[in-house]
Amino acid sequence: MAARPGAITNADSASGGGEEEGKHVKPFTPEKAKEIIMCLQQPAVFYNMVFDWPAQHWTAKHLSEVLHGKQIRFRMGTKSTDTAPQFETACNYVEATLEEFLSWNSDQSSISGAFRDYDHSKFWAYADYKYFVSLFEDKTDIFQDVIWSDFGFPGRNGQESTLWIGSLGAHTPCHLDTYGCNLVFQVQGRKRWHLFPPEDTPFLYPTRIPYEESSVFSKINVVNPDLKRFPQFRKARRHMVTLSPGQVLFVPRHWWHYVESIDPVTVSINSWIELEEDHQTRVEEAITRMLVCALKTAENPHNTRAWLNPTELEETSHEINCHYLNGAISAFFNHYGTSEVVETQALRTNREYTIKEELNMHSHVGVEQAGGHNLSSETVKQEAASPFGLDLVPVTPSSEEPSSERGGIFENDGEDFVSKNGKSFGKRQRMMSESENAVVEQIASDRTVAVSQTFVSTDDLLDCLVNPQVTRIVAQLLIQGRST
């Protein structure tokens, strides 16, 4: 991607920048940046906000020197074109240093050590979800190299961040994060993001197997979908953007995303921002954990690897899961106080998926609202005051329908954003009027191609019981039942 007008390029940064950086003014104050983040309902890319961060120099080579031979866990995946997602439960893992990773990634024939069994032409490696507090436990000063306070979150730095280092082809399967929203700073190399709005959830065929708290996975390999098995995916609205060094991507709450490294080495830093809705989400996640662990351990108490994501150390007992659930409900009540406030919040969260007009469109609780085709006067005013421009570019829907061929997918590269008439910035207004209808449609379409129309597996049952729409309703019933 070409450098944007007035931007400090990666080459400028590498050469020091000097006086030019000192003169450069960030396009948004911390207060304005936070306002945008807390109000924006679609993904967008920030420009010219991190040119003075020390972390902009954190290449994999630099980090290998900082870590001094520290062992890191890498996820090893195959460079395949399968139609099935490559979940983390299907990957192998190696413990290696960044020096070993860089040597292997350079395709040296004399490679040995942890990567010796993995042909670089057939495998990719990904050091993902590396929390700074563990990775740099003896170098805490480095936390200050990441300055999320520039986005309006005082005191937030590397301590609340994770690091991602990958080779060409490394990716995360399509999923949504149940908690918060996400800021992603691209440091080295480029990553391609495939994003889908929350209201497209029925078309992404959500599943909680493999189980990981805070992640809802899609059954679909979105870059090579099996449309015969998952025909509803044709209705999903793909948004694509290639994130380059020096850019920061904002991922709103509950947006699905599949992320792939498209350069030989990529380095990213992200931070999940807590939101008000997380209080109820904790109840939903506790319900999910209890049901998944109960059914899957009953099915096969000795084989957790097949269903428990490697990020989860072990399955938790029913007693512990009951403790989690009661703790989440207690925390919800402690936060909201009176029973009237609690019930109002529960009802409000329920309506966010069905009645758009009853909620403030310019707030995070409105991310997944339904709505008609007529724009209110308030909506028009908001679009007229759109924050988008040269330094904040929206990620808009792709120009073509998803294809099973990778070459058939087009993307928004962040350069050619639309004009401020509001017609192309917002999400297309399409949403089921009832959350139950969305659940039924997803479940029905998921059974279109099955070996047997009558056999129901434990996973089939769980796909219904812990469908995000179902656990949301159950959580609301639990909360409302205790608010009287």
Curated annotation (Swiss-Prot):
Region described as Interaction with HSPB1: 88-208
Localization in the cell: Cytoplasm
UniProt keyword terms in alphabetical order: Cytoplasm, Stress response
Keyword Cytoplasm: yes
Residues in JmjC domain copies: 124-288
Residue numbers spanned by region Disordered: 1-26, 396-429
Pfam name, any one: Cupin_8
Record-annotated disulphide pairs: none
Matches recorded under PANTHER family: HSPB1-ASSOCIATED PROTEIN 1, HYPOXIA-INDUCIBLE FACTOR 1 ALPHA INHIBITOR-RELATED
Name under which the protein is recorded: HSPB1-associated protein 1
Record organism: Bos taurus (Bovine)
Lineage: Eukaryota, Metazoa, Chordata, Craniata, Vertebrata
